[in-house]
Every structure is written in structure tokens, then in C-alpha cells.
Amino acid sequence: MEIRSGDELAFRRVYQEVFPTVMKVAYHVTYNQDVAEDICQDAFIRFYDKDIEFPSMDDAKFWLIRVVKNLAINHVKRKVRETASLEKFMKGPQVNPFRDGQTEVILQESTAAVRKAVSQLPEIYRTVIVLREYADLNYSEIAKVLKISESNVKVRMHRARKELSAMLDREEVNVP
């Protein structure tokens, strides 16, 4: 099935299928719901306006994920330069009324520490972590998005997890 940008019917199908995934990517790079929605909207406008033919739905999906990832990273870099900190973009998890207070505090602290550590990873490692853990892409899909080999994705993922683990160990963070 061929998908041509500018085709309203194809656009609607792509939007319905791909929006949840790109929204996860944008949110887990920016940690801001409104910004993530704006980034996704911008990416879909570019998709619609761009004169590109995609051989399949997957090709359109990977193109959109790549655009959203780049827009989100650029947004964060811009904000970091302006504020010199990602901390205000990181929201803690919502309180679960079924957990006791101590468990909730530990979970919130652990989640904040992991997010902080992920934000401090080099971009090539942070990107594979976000695409795998938050966008739920498999290694071959990540390879297509990043235009690298699947084995390179595995190497980056291994190094990212190793570096993330070392960062959390240095901070003495126990992840439940």
C-alpha cells in the first residue's frame, strides 16, 4: 500500500495509527504533555505538506517518528540553553492511592532519579532508550527510525543500559 502525503484519506489512516506512538516519543523526550502535542502536530503538518511517497505504512510511521524525535530533542536543547536545566520539564509520577506513603515516596524518588539519569545520557544512548522503553519499538524498528543497523541498535542499547546503571549506582538509587 502506497501512502502519499497530501492525500487526506491516507493522512487520516496514518494519523490514527501512528499518533499514539509519536506522542509517547515526544512526551518521553520533553516530559511535557502540551509541548509533546505541539511537536506531534508540527510533525503531522510537515507530513501532510511534504511531497513524499511512502511505500508502506511502516515507512510513513518511521519517517514521522524520526521527525518527532528530532523536533523534541531540538526543543529540549533549546530549553536547556534557556534554563540550563531539564528539571522543570520532568514531572513526577502520579500518586497511587493504593500504595502506602513510604512506597509512593520511594517510587517517586526512583522515577525522578531514572529520568534525570536518562536525560544525562549522551543523545545516541538516550534516543535508543526512549524509542525502546517509551515508544515500545523493537530493535529493527529503532534501526529503521535511526537509519542504523540492528546490531548497532543493540550495541547502543547495551551501552546505554550499562551507563544508566552506573549512573544510578553512583547516586545509590535502588530502582524497585
Q: Could you describe each region identified by the protein language model?
A:
Residues 74, 82-111, 138:
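Internal acidic/polar
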Residues 1-24:
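A short, charge-rich alpha-helical start-of-domain segment used by transcription regulators
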Residues 55, 66-87, 107, 159:
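Arg/Lys-rich amphipathic alpha helix in sigma70-family domain 2
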Residues 69, 73, 140, 145-170:
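DNA-recognition helix of helix-turn-helix
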Residues 38-45, 49, 58-70:
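Structural recognition of an alpha-helix C-terminal capping motif at a helix-to-coil junction
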Residues 1-2, 113-121:
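Short amphipathic alpha-helical boundary/capping segments
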Residues 19, 23, 44, 122, ...:
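C-terminal flanking helix
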Residues 128-132:
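A short pre-motif secondary-structure segment
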